[in-house]
């Protein structure tokens, strides 16, 4: 059997097993990581939005 076919077969089997798991109301761990990452990105965006006018004003003075 070709290695590529074996790899694809194993990959499909893993995806089927992971796709059938249900965690009820609680989010799956992979989605929790995504939510945490999204929250970090939102915090960085908000901090940059607040800090950039201050930095621009400081550079204009100096």
From Swiss-Prot:
Chief place of localization: secreted
Keywords of this entry: Antibiotic, Antimicrobial, Immunity, Innate immunity, Secreted, Signal
Signal peptide as annotated in the record: 1-19
PROSITE patterns: CECROPIN (PS00268)
One cellular-component annotation, GO: extracellular space
One Pfam match: Cecropin
Subcellular compartments: Secreted
A GO BP annotation: antibacterial humoral response
Similarity section: Belongs to the cecropin family.
Further comment: Protects mice against Escherichia coli and Pseudomonas aeruginosa infection.
Function: Putative antimicrobial peptide. Partially neutralizes lipopolysaccharides (LPS). Exhibits anti-inflammatory properties: inhibits LPS-induced iNOS/NOS2 transcription, nitric oxide (NO) and pro-inflammatory cytokine production in mouse macrophages and human peripheral blood mononuclear cells (PBMCs); inhibits LPS-induced activation of MAPK and NF-kappa-B signaling pathways in mouse macrophages.
Name the record gives this protein: Cecropin-N
Protein's gene: CECN
